[in-house]
């Protein structure tokens, strides 16, 4: 979303994570997505780093606050703690040592913080959208999609926040589907 927000032109290469192309590993040893290669050849293979690079290298930095340590701290907590529990909640059959409800409860401990924050501000950090919202949104969306009714029943403010971002023109713009990339594909910008 940060790339689209700042109108950075990119070549999109949609891949199957079950059949990752060798070119992905040639560019990034991690073999994970997303990966951004700048026109200067810099390889960035972390979502947050891509967002920060995009926002810092464009004139419009309204998604950032002056000292963005707090933003980074919130995003890192989400990426480290919430993502761990989210994966176990979504794929609970792969983690039979605990119940689906156990994993949901661990996610809920973090979601409750977000819900409480939304009692004070329109978005997760302030009254205007920020990089925190954009970084955390996909994970909250994944959580909600496991059992939307339960999510909706328990998180009124997060449900509204999620609906607002999901219905934004920016989100709709980036969610268009692409065919799987191969060497013969034309570039999609």
Regions found by a protein language model. Give the residues of each.
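GST-like domain detector, emphasizing the conserved glutathione-binding G-site
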Residues: 1-106
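Acidic carboxylate-rich catalytic motifs and surrounding loops in phosphoryl-/glycosyl-chemistry enzymes
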Residues: 14-15, 174-180
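A short hydrophobic/aromatic micro-motif that marks alpha-helical segments and, especially, helix-coil
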Residues: 61, 148, 183-184
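GST-like fold's C-terminal all-alpha helical module
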Residues: 74-167
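Long, charge-rich low-complexity segments
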Residues: 177-189
């Amino acid at each position: 979303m940060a790339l689209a927000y700042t109108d950075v032109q990119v070549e999109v290469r949609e891949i199957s994570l079950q059949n990752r192309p060798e070119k992905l590993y040639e560019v990034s040893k991690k073999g994970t997505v997303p990966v951004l290669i700048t026109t200067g050849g810099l390889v960035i293979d972390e979502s947050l780093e891509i967002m920060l690079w995009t926002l810092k290298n464009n004139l419009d930095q309204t998604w950032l606050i002056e000292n963005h340590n707090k933003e980074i701290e919130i995003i890192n907590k989400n990426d480290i703690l919430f993502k761990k529990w989210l994966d176990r909640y979504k794929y609970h059959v792969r983690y039979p040592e605990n119940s689906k409800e156990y994993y949901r409860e661990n996610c809920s401990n973090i979601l409750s913080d977000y819900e409480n924050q939304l009692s004070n501000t329109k978005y997760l950090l302030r009254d205007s959208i920020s990089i925190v919202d954009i970084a955390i949104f996909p994970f909250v969306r994944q959580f909600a999609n496991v059992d939307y009714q339960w999510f909706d029943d328990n998180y009124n403010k997060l449900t509204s926040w999620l609906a607002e971002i999901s219905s934004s023109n920016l989100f709709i713009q980036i969610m268009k589907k692409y065919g799987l990339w191969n060497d013969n594909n034309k570039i999609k910008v």
